[in-house]
Swiss-Prot record:
PROSITE patterns: XPG_1, XPG_2. HAMAP family: Fen. This is Flap endonuclease 1. It comes from Drosophila yakuba. GO terms for cellular component: mitochondrion; nucleolus; nucleoplasm. Mg(2+) 1 binds at D34, D86, E158, E160. Binds 2 magnesium ions per subunit. They probably participate in the reaction catalyzed by the enzyme. May bind an additional third magnesium ion after substrate binding. One of its GO terms (molecular function) is manganese ion binding.
């Protein structure tokens, strides 16, 4: 689910935090990609040009086709992807998972009704709702990535949290996902639509964590509370509080505890046994692997291994697979080109460092004004009188 209404809220109140770019503008960047989100996109995507979507046994292969060709496209544009796979969901997510199971049952009933009625549009619509990424899909994708020479990371828990940890550690530039909660986990950059097909012609949307905090006039802790009020995967939200009211409450009271002390109970009903504190801690201290211990390496592809894996039962065109392998090799050789800013190490930003820089700038400005005042006011010269 991500965070309900967050994207629009940022667009309305902190538009400077969003930048649209072409994919080529991320040349030389390392990006952590939410693998499950990608696989879901690939599984529901409508394929054209006579592409094979299943094995001889009828098992889907669209997730492998998508992973293969989209990854090649990223590498063609000088982007180094690392895919991050979900681990076990946190216990607090069980409520959201139960809701998804209910929606799945409803979709199954609706699909049967659409099938009985011969409603082709309805059949397609509800079939898409029933798609889910399985462990087998993920394992096949990992095997494919290994053969392509592209690294992946198994997150102990949420992939978005692990992506954010890689960004904060300086291992990668950004998190690529459609789920906005990567920002709630503290990813300093979020890229949306990066793995969309070229045919959709969607510019990549880059969200800046620092600029959104500045635009919303809140700090990182307050941003987490805002996201909980908007609606997240870990607890219920307060019915009747939409995005506009949520940011007003955060700006007025700064945290959920104070909001609850001042909330009009005749207008809003707080969920019983509301686990907002546990949800907050999940965002502040998520279960992630230590990013410093993760070694990311992009190596040469195994062309023969790719042919063996994708052709045969999976029915990929050998010619296209070999052409793809050659593109991978070419991209690997071109990786010697680097961005100019890669020569300068960027240290992870911290609130203390930012505040110190601001204080230093203010002190320098104050010192300059004092000198100016002394120069213009001293000795009876023709300088301007101090105001």
């Amino acid at each position: 689910m991500g965070i309900l209404g967050l994207s629009k809220l940022i667009a309305d109140l902190a538009p400077q935090a969003i930048r649209e770019s072409e994919i080529k503008n991320f040349f030389g960047r390392k990006v952590a990609i939410d693998a499950s989100m990608c696989l879901y996109q690939f599984l529901i995507a409508v394929r054209s040009e006579g592409a094979q979507l299943a094995t001889v046994n009828g098992d889907p292969t669209s997730h492998l086709m998508g992973m293969f060709y989209r990854t090649i496209r990223l590498l063609d544009n000088g982007i180094k992807p690392v895919y991050v796979f979900d681990g076990k969901p946190p216990d607090l997510k069980s409520g959201e998972l139960a809701k998804r199971a209910e929606r799945r049952e409803e979709a199954e009933k609706a699909l049967k009704a659409a099938t009985d009625a011969g409603d082709d549009a309805g059949i397609e619509k509800f079939n898409r709702r029933l798609v889910r990424v399985t462990k087998e899909h993920a394992n096949e994708a990992k095997e494919l990535l290994t053969l392509m020479g592209v690294p992946y990371v198994d997150a102990p828990c949420e992939a978005e949290a692990q992506c954010a940890a890689l960004v904060k550690a300086g291992k990668v530039y950004a998190t690529a996902t459609e789920d906005m909660d990567a920002l709630t986990f503290g990813s300093t950059k979020l890229l949306r639509y990066l793995t969309y097909s070229e045919a959709r012609k969607m510019p990549v949307k880059e969200f800046s964590y620092e600029k959104l905090l500045e635009g919303l006039s809140i700090n990182s802790r307050e941003f987490i509370d805002l996201c909980i009020l908007l609606g997240c995967d870990y607890c219920e939200s307060i019915k009747g509080i939409g995005p506009k009211r949520a940011i007003e409450l955060i700006n007025n009271y700064r945290d959920i505890e104070t909001i609850l002390d001042n909330l009009d109970s005749s207008k809003y009903t707080v969920p019983e046994n509301w686990n907002y504190k546990v949800a907050r801690e999940l965002f502040i201290e998520p279960e992630v692997a230590n990013a410093d211990n993760i070694d990311l390496k992009w190596v040469e592809p195994d062309e023969e291994g790719l042919v063996k894996f994708l052709c045969g039962d999976r029915q990929f065109s050998e010619e296209r697979v070999r052409n793809g392998a050659k593109k991978l090799m070419k991209s690997k050789q071109a990786q010697t080109q680097v961005r100019l800013d890669s020569f300068f190490k960027t240290l992870p930003s911290t609130p203390n460092a930012t505040n110190a820089a601001k204080r230093k700038a203010e002190e320098a400005k104050k010192s300059a004004n004092n000198k100016k005042a002394k120069t213009s006011g001293g000795g009876g010269g023709r300088g301007r009188r101090p105001k």
